Amino acid sequence: MSNVMKVSFEEGEIKTPDKAHSSTVKLGNVTMSKTTLQPGWSWSSCIKPIVGTESCQAGHVGVVIKGEMKVKHDDGTEDNFKAGDAYYLAPGHDGWFVSDDEFISYEFTSDQKDFGPWKKS
C-alpha cells in the first residue's frame, strides 16, 4: 500500500435507496461511506422493506456533518445525533429524521477492527 493515497467519493460504489444516497470507498483495509439522507427518511420506512429485518443489524461508527437524526436501539436506548457528533451504534436500531434539512454523515469500518460489532473471535 502506498504511503499517500486518495480516492474521491464520486468514484465510490453508489447506492440510492429511497430518500438516500451513499458512496462507499476503500483505502487499504479501511472502508469509508458518505451518506446523504433526505427529509422524511427513516430506516423502518426506507430500508426495512429491502432488508426484511425488524431493525438495522449493521453496526456504525461515524460523524454527522449536517442535520439531525433520532436513533432508538432495540434495548430502548434513544439519542439524537446532530452535526459535529461522533457516534457508535450497535446492531439492532432504527433511525429517523428530526430536522427539516438533509442529513450527511461519514462512516468508517476496518478489516482490522477489534471492538463493537466487528470484534474478532
Task: Give names to the regions the model predicted.
Residues 90-115:
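Ligand-binding loop in jelly-roll beta-barrel domains
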Residues 39, 110-121:
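Glyoxalase I/VOC metalloenzyme domain signal
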Residues 49-75:
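Glycine- and acidic-residue-biased ligand/ion/polar-headgroup-sensing regions
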Residues 1-36, 44-45, 120-121:
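A short, N-terminal "cap"/entry segment at the start of jelly-roll beta-barrel domains
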Residues 24, 32-36, 61, 78, ...:
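Conserved hydrophobic/aromatic beta-strand scaffold that supports enzyme active sites
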Residues 73-93:
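Short acidic-glycine-tyrosine-enriched beta hairpin
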Residues 28-33, 39, 59-60, 65-67, ...:
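A generic structural signal for short beta-strands and their flanking turns/coil linkers
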Residues 42-43, 67-72, 95:
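Short beta-strand segments in beta-sandwich/barrel cores
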